[in-house]
Design a protein with these regions (language model features):
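Short hydrophobic/aromatic beta-strand or adjacent loop that forms the aromatic wall/cage
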Residues: 55-57, 141-146
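Acetyl-CoA-dependent GNAT
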Residues: 10, 21-92
Length: 151
């Protein structure tokens, strides 16, 4: 599959919302949550008014039809809290290297980011991908793993 990775722009807010919903769906075998879950304040803060100062991210697009394959993005958090990286790859396009390419692009573009975290379901195979990029398990419960990367 040929794809291109480009920066997310303010015009891509709809893509960020779509990818946020995919990120919240969890594993492909779980029942997806209702689409309106993204409007809950604890999740909407990752997408609402995308393109503000400090918002950074990348999207992978199919070279053939320009379809969205995945995205990785970051929004500066309130002072004193660890920043959270949001990340999603569309089902059917996972395990093809797209996630690794997105994370590589994000890490290269943000060398000054000395601390970042992400949350993932413990059964998600992407845990191994995150570990390859230096993320380590910081907290674990039955339904979520918080991973942190420090440089």
């Amino acid at each position: 599959m040929d794809y291109v990775i480009r920066p997310l722009t303010p015009a891509d807010e709809a893509i960020v919302w779509e990818m946020l919903y995919l990120a919240l769906q969890g594993s492909e075998s779980s029942t997806p949550p209702p689409p309106e879950i993204v409007r809950r304040p604890e999740y909407a803060r990752y997408a609402e008014h995308w393109g503000r100062e400090g918002d950074r991210g990348f999207v992978a697009c199919d070279k053939g039809d320009n379809g969205i394959l995945g995205a990785v993005w970051f929004r500066p958090p309130p002072e004193g809290t660890t920043p959270v990286l949001a990340f999603a790859v569309r089902p059917g396009h996972r395990k093809l290297g797209i996630g690794a390419a997105l994370l590589t692009q994000w890490v290269r573009a943000n060398p000054q980011q000395d601390e970042i975290s992400l949350k993932v379901q413990p059964t998600n195979p992407a845990v191994r991908l995150y570990e390859r990029f230096g993320f380590k398990i910081a907290q674990q419960s039955d339904d979520a793993v918080t991973m942190r990367r420090e440089i």
